[in-house]
């Protein structure tokens, strides 16, 4: 069977990790990755390759696939929802412009979702919200991410030592991931963190990185943070911090937290969809309300 995996671009994030694991689970099938940024996610490309299953993993790729409403696709279309990004508008002011943008995105997503043969939600929370937001009739299946200890990379030959930092935050730098909340929490208790020599390692790249660097300088905590940049297979670097911090505003079902649980790491995470689903029964985790700087700061002060 020929399975086409559609992404926006090849990256080091959780979406691409999901695709890699999907491909590994189909050793007897012919699999190929198509990138929307290279204009590859079209009906013509799918039909030319003979795709029997078209598995889209990003909205941009799905939009490119269905851009021509008259093109007829020969394959069965699956779309995996890696977090409901419409939630972004829950954190923005209710201005007329934002209300229009939310309506436009919701309308577009409803149109695209209804053209899929199957929609995969990673959590029960997302499945319920997909039905609530996009239509009760949609063919939604819940297929949680999973990770086993046998697949974990050994923490050898890393750039930093094990437990070298008090905290580590690994994520693409964008609004969703909430690094600004973490920087503000560090600033809130900077005297204590400085006295106890508790530094935070940030790993990742992205459009929000420059803003976060500037915010750290503006709040006077540059000496308490280190930015390592983007690192391939960065999950293993959670061992370089004694506690992993995940301050996201929303998530799908993050591989990073699944890996942290598999490694038995201590975790401080925001109580958002995705994080909550992964950590609800994990004893080495504590959670704080989304965007609650004071609560996160208190937990950082008391962390070992």
Q: Each predicted region: which residue ranges?
A:
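A conserved mid-protein helix/loop that constitutes part of the nucleotide-sugar donor-binding site
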Residues: 14-21, 165, 169-191, 207-213
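Short His-centered aromatic/hydrophobic patch
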Residues: 56-62, 81-84
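Membrane-proximal helix-turn-helix segments that form the acceptor-binding/catalytic region
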Residues: 99-119
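Helix-loop-beta element that forms the nucleotide-linked donor phosphate-binding surface
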Residues: 127-147
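Nucleotide-activated donor-binding/catalytic signature segment of Leloir-type glycosyltransferases, i.e.
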Residues: 213-229
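Aromatic "clamp/platform" in nucleotide-sugar-dependent glycosyltransferases that forms part
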Residues: 230, 249
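Short hydrophobic beta-strand element within catalytic cores of glycosyltransferases
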Residues: 266-269
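Conserved acidic donor-binding segment of nucleotide-sugar-dependent glycosyltransferases
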Residues: 281-293, 301-304
